[in-house]
């Protein structure tokens, strides 16, 4: 019999009711401080990997014990994941970093069938979990005790302003015919078994994003990875796997004219994607992350029903919040438009959750796609039968490669 070493949980909880603290996610009014310790079952003497395939933690939330089960999100990166940035003289620098032993997880709460979790374990635990219908955020505290974490509700992060935050959607692309009404396609409103589909996503961060994060490529990389991990979690309810296949950072200058006029920027991004990006990187959809303030309180813009179109399978998203969860909701929303989803009503709820396809973004207990969004997506599949999302982006063991100029090099090249 294999001897098993059990690392037990020891944690203390110190609620700071009514206190305020400045965290990476913003100024938080009400939070708990916890010291989570991992439960690990390994054969005696076994070498523990840096990031295990499965992990388990215990927390106390509102005084009640919570067991958090986490599983590495092996769908997060495609087999040919790459990263591109630019040298000061404009040369493309492209690498294929090894991401097999990454630190991004999805999971659930024990004894809560409706629970979900999307967590980064890169430096402590950071992300969110849904418990009894309520969304909680967790992130490390910068204290002398490195094990301290804050747990808080999204609603307890102070609002930066009260202005309405809206999404734009364009339906007047001449190259794409309008989507038929659901009633024309004889959809079954009770049908929940959607087919498995796969989206290989490219995220492009513009030069303002690069400057906003102090020209730190690693900070931008981590932020985008966490956002896509959240998006991947949202789309599991639709049986869609979203994998990041490329991250491009415009580190020297923007490759297109970025304007506050969101429609003009979207048009320019569409042209660049078709004439440049698609010629060097196979993918299904590209989203532009920009730090410019878009016009008319717009947080994002995307054409409707254009997934797999060589020009229009795109969206733009303003980097509007330090809360990665809200950024994930915004980008998932724009991606939803590409998949044929129209806006829900402004007060749409699915149970206690806010609908992801609401026209405006507000903080809520949790976020989900509505039944209407599922039906819009299903009718898009029936009408257009998009082919690019049929292939499964299987993971392989990539090898980190040195770089010279704008070319990918073989491992070990000098």
Curated annotation (Swiss-Prot):
EC number(s) per entry: 3.4.24.42
Location of Pyrrolidone carboxylic acid modifications: 191
Binding-site residues for Zn(2+), renumbered to this chain: 333, 337, 343
Gene Ontology BP term (one): collagen catabolic process
Region forming the signal peptide: 1-20
Disulfide bonds: 308-388, 348-355
GO cellular component: extracellular region; plasma membrane
Main location: secreted
UniProt remark on cofactor binding: Binds 1 zinc ion per subunit.
Cofactor(s) for this UniProt protein: Zn(2+)
Post-translational modification as stated in the protein's UniProt record: The N-terminus is blocked.
Positions of the propeptide segment: 21-190, 394-414
Protein's cellular compartments: Secreted
Keyword Thylakoid: no
Protein name: Snake venom metalloproteinase atrolysin-D
Species in which this protein is naturally found: Crotalus atrox (Western diamondback rattlesnake)
Lineage per the UniProt record: Eukaryota, Metazoa, Chordata, Craniata, Vertebrata
